[in-house]
Amino acid sequence: MSWDDEDFDIPSNSKKTVAASWEDEEDDGPVLESWDVDPEEEEKKKKEAKLQEAKRKAELKAKEDAEKAKKDAKRKELEQFDQLDERTRKELLKKAELNADLNNAADLFGGLGVADDNDDDDFDINEHPRERITKQQLAAAAASKRPALTKDTPLEEHPLFQPTNKQEYEKLRKTVGTSLTRLNEDSSLLYASSLAVDLIRDLSQPLSVENLRKVISTLNVVIKDKERQERQARLKKAGGTATGGAGKKKAKPLARPNVGGGFKKDAFDDMDDGQFDDLDDDDFM
């Protein structure tokens, strides 16, 4: 038997396998061409772009806010500098010029560092020590200067209204008393009705009964003194005395005799005029 006479049937399942593979393959998604873009990928890219844009805007806003804060700090520093007295201002300007010269020298000798003009951080590694000291001195001088008082400034912020001992309380009393009593010259009616009476009442609220009696006794002394002064003023105006008497009446001048021609003479005067003859001794015989 030769090999040529034998028939070998070689089973081949390639077609069936391929067919089965195509039939079994299931893809619910749409078939995309080579130039089409996946919608999910596109949405993801849009979200990332939005996040990047929001981040960029936030950084830009933070940078603008930081620049604005620096400008405000510079402006406040200049305002505080303008409020300083002339002597302190000259000293600070002199120190600033000296520090500028030192910083220039530092640049020449290796760039030891000059602080950035727009840098207002508390500490800068590149800031010159002299310039840092100048800033500290300027801040201390501005802080020590008394702020200008306005009508809206609370009185509690004034050092005078922060007494801690007897001397400071007496100074407060004298200062406030003198300042308030001057208002009586402008309007005595408003001073009495809208200030003095109500102020005394308000100041007496925290006092104890014993201290209130002291206040009343003090006011009684003031009342008696005022009554005495007013009585003396009335008597002085009327020409009386300080003790309350009416005073001595002025003596009336004596009446001068009328020596004119119309004055009537009596009988004795007629005798002087020679109307009666001289009597002799024989007339009485």
Curated annotation (Swiss-Prot):
Major localisation: cytoplasm
Keywords attached to this entry: Coiled coil, Cytoplasm, Initiation factor, Protein biosynthesis
Annotated family: Belongs to the eIF-3 subunit J family.
InterPro entries, per the entry: eIF3-like_dom_sf, eIF3j
Record flagged with keyword Metal-binding: no
Annotated region described as Disordered, given as residue ranges: 1-86, 232-285
Job of this protein: Component of the eukaryotic translation initiation factor 3 (eIF-3) complex, which is involved in protein synthesis of a specialized repertoire of mRNAs and, together with other initiation factors, stimulates binding of mRNA and methionyl-tRNAi to the 40S ribosome. The eIF-3 complex specifically targets and initiates translation of a subset of mRNAs involved in cell proliferation.
Oligomeric form and interacting partners: Component of the eukaryotic translation initiation factor 3 (eIF-3) complex.
Membrane-spanning segments: none
A Gene Ontology cellular-component term: eukaryotic translation initiation factor 3 complex
Biased composition (Basic and acidic residues): 42-86
Biased composition (Acidic residues): 22-41, 269-285
Protein name (database record): Eukaryotic translation initiation factor 3 subunit J
Subcellular location: Cytoplasm
GO molecular function: translation initiation factor activity
Protein's organism: Candida albicans (strain SC5314 / ATCC MYA-2876) (Yeast)
Coiled coil stretches, renumbered: 36-81
Any one biological process term the GO annotation gives: nuclear-transcribed mRNA catabolic process, nonsense-mediated decay
Gene3D superfamilies: Eukaryotic translation initiation factor 3 like domains
